[in-house]
Amino acid sequence: MPDYLGADQRKTKEEEKEDKPIRSLDEGDIALLKTYGQSTYSRQIKQVEDDIQQLLKKINELTGIKESDTGLAPPALWDLAADKQTLQSEQPLQVARCTKIINADSEDPKYIINVKQFAKFVVDLSDQVAPTDIEEGMRVGVDRNKYQIHIPLPPKIDPTVTMMQVEEKPDVTYSDVGGCKEQIEKLREVVETPLLHPERFVNLGIEPPKGVLLFGPPGTGKTLCARAVANRTDACFIRVIGSELVQKYVGEGARMVRELFEMARTKKACLIFFDEIDAIGGARFDDGAGGDNEVQRTMLELINQLDGFDPRGNIKVLMATNRPDTLDPALMRPGRLDRKIEFSLPDLEGRTHIFKIHARSMSVERDIRFELLARLCPNSTGAEIRSVCTEAGMFAIRARRKVATEKDFLEAVNKVIKSYAKFSATPRYMTYN
């Protein structure tokens, strides 16, 4: 159909179309648009999430949980009268030890308790304690009037031993450890497989290895692997430095070892890492003065706990040392330390991997030849390669650059590997391992 409108009229019609008012969306249209892309159960899931948030809010209000500078509940939730009544009704208890249970199978058993530095008493249980909760040798809380047993207490453990437990997992993973692929596989066979797949050992009828010795020159990644194991496993991780068990008074070191394994037995699964074990695990000798007798007693207690009369339970033990030649043969035998893993100097592939691991968190140029840098660092440990990367960053900072170049790495190799070679103890320690 021919268009009889002129250009001006056609332009006027187009302007009317453009000037036509735009209708805004109402609430129904917006709600409909929001439903696009949602699943069938989105509304029900959203309703359940809202209900959970409301319940959490009510629980926090009832329990008085609220962030404040003092850490106290709001004053509106204080109940001073009830607190005073609780203080008057609950008297402080005295710590005693149950030494013997008389007529344990009868309906009215009696308990002999020993109050330290005071006396022994034959007492009954209070109404709050069941007879099955009390065992011989257990610490209990008794009142000061009738000396009735009101509460069972956990075993006494030295605070220094409790502080050895690692609460927060380290941030080191197996991908952060370079040049130790074979060692990590052997370590995971001993630590992770028995915890995650114990049925494999039951089907074969063997007991998994319970002790591992990590030995090698300084800086080869022994402690780093232990930190990666602590990050990987959900078991309780206890870290002990060998020098912490060397105490001034007679019997203190052996007592700490006993309490350490007592605490470990209370856990579902536990991993104990002894770093620098040569501080207490040296071979026994008589120097005539008796200076090392206490250290030897501590080592004998450790030997007994590793494979003595009492079963060790689900406790794995890792030990690390730079001098395996100084350790006592009784500590090294199978049954106590079943597997010995050597951490030798990394090869070319391992050194390249270590360079890439440390450069991963640095601002570096692209196309840096890490294999060339690894070839320029023969017989170097992982710690020395890390020092090379740090020095390369220092050269970049000195030149007021934001990125480290390959030239910085080459200068760092000359400084750390070549200039500091006279300070390196790796050749000497290689003769010990």
Curated annotation (Swiss-Prot):
Question: So where does ATP get bound?
Answer: 216-223
Q: Output the InterPro entries linked to this UniProt entry.
A: 26S_Proteasome_ATPase, AAA+_ATPase, AAA_lid_3, ATPase_AAA_core, ATPase_AAA_CS, NA-bd_OB-fold, P-loop_NTPase, PRS7-like_OB
Question: GO molecular function, one example?
Answer: ATP hydrolysis activity
Q: Which Gene3D superfamilies match?
A: 1.10.8.60, Nucleic acid-binding proteins, P-loop containing nucleotide triphosphate hydrolases
Query: Where in the cell?
Result: Cytoplasm; Nucleus
Pfam families on file: AAA, AAA_lid_3, PRS7_OB
Swiss-Prot/TrEMBL GO biological process terms: proteasome-mediated ubiquitin-dependent protein catabolic process; ubiquitin-dependent protein catabolic process
- Ranges annotated as biased composition (Basic and acidic residues): 8-23
State the SUPFAM superfamilies in the record.
P-loop containing nucleoside triphosphate hydrolases
| CC terms in the record's Gene Ontology section | cytoplasm; nucleus; proteasome accessory complex; proteasome complex; proteasome regulatory particle, base subcomplex
- UniProtKB keywords: ATP-binding, Cytoplasm, Nucleotide-binding, Nucleus, Phosphoprotein, Proteasome
Mod. after translation: Phosphorylated. Dephosphorylated by ublcp1 which impairs psmc2 ATPase activity and disrupts 26S proteasome assembly.
Where do the segments described as Disordered lie? 1-23
Q: Which family does it belong to?
A: Belongs to the AAA ATPase family.
Functional description taken from the UniProt entry:
The 26S proteasome is involved in the ATP-dependent degradation of ubiquitinated proteins. The regulatory (or ATPase) complex confers ATP dependency and substrate specificity to the 26S complex.
> What name has this protein been given in UniProt?
26S proteasome regulatory subunit 7
Organism the protein comes from: Xenopus laevis (African clawed frog)
Q: Which gene encodes it?
A: psmc2
